[in-house]
Regions:
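The alpha/beta-hydrolase serine catalytic core
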Residues: 138-175
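Conserved alpha/beta-hydrolase "nucleophile elbow" surrounding the catalytic nucleophile
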Residues: 97, 101-106
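A conserved amphipathic alpha-helix that caps or lines the catalytic cleft of carbohydrate-
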Residues: 43, 89, 112-113
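Flexible "cap/lid" loop of the alpha/beta hydrolase fold
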Residues: 107-152
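Active-site micro-motifs of SAM-dependent methyltransferase domains
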Residues: 34, 61, 106, 130-131
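N-terminal cap/lid segment of alpha/beta-hydrolase-fold proteins
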Residues: 1-10
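Active-site loop/oxyanion-hole signature of alpha/beta-hydrolase fold enzymes
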Residues: 50, 56-98
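Conserved HGGG/HGGXW glycine-rich cap/lid loop of the alpha/beta-hydrolase fold
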Residues: 9-68
Length: 175
């Protein structure tokens, strides 16, 4: 796994080079408990199928990426979209990426596109947060019970290592 310095933090990422000329760079944005490794083989398969350069990274505090020193706020997705994502794109030297985001990553992609409409080539999102439904909040409350009563922490630790508890509680407490 590679690492890159972005806004004073070391972020892990994988970079799949383009295999065809003139293709955009795809940038994958993970969900609320995700990271590079949780995408499994999808990035590699998508890069091969499209011929595009594809970059997938773990946001600050996820996977093998360094965490923010300060606690998460309810505006964490705005911070990612308006500060960290532009800094990452600049650090990687990407011009007009095509953003592909799932859940939190989809919301971050949409916020980024709204804040910087000329920056992305396009945005594709899966299950972004446009509004919060009661059923979503109930599911997140249920996830806390699963966290406390099953091996969920051990399973997440395969990807988030020593940061696992913070990753889960930041996600769960924010909602």
């Amino acid at each position: 796994m590679k690492h890159i310095a972005v806004s004073g933090l070391k972020l892990e990422y994988r970079d799949f080079p383009a295999t065809a000329e003139g293709r955009p760079t795809l940038l994958l944005l993970h969900e609320g408990l995700g990271c590079v490794t949780m995408w499994r083989h999808f990035p590699e398969k998508l890069a091969a199928a499209t011929g595009c350069r594809l970059i997938v990274w773990s946001r600050a505090g996820y996977g093998g990426s360094e965490a923010y020193a300060e606690p998460r706020t309810p505006r964490y997705m705005h911070r990612e979209a308006e500060e960290m994502l532009p800094a990452l794109i600049a650090a990687l030297g990407i011009a007009r990426p095509l953003l592909i985001g799932h859940s939190d990553g989809g919301t971050i992609a949409l916020i980024f596109a709204g804040a910087f409409p000329e920056a992305p080539l396009g945005v594709a999102v899966m299950a972004p947060h446009e509004f919060v439904e009661d059923v979503t909040l109930a599911g997140i409350r249920d996830a806390r019970v699963v966290w406390k009563t099953t091996d969920m922490a051990q399973k997440l630790a395969r990807c988030h290592h020593a940061q696992t508890e913070r990753v889960f509680l930041d996600w769960n407490d924010t909602w």
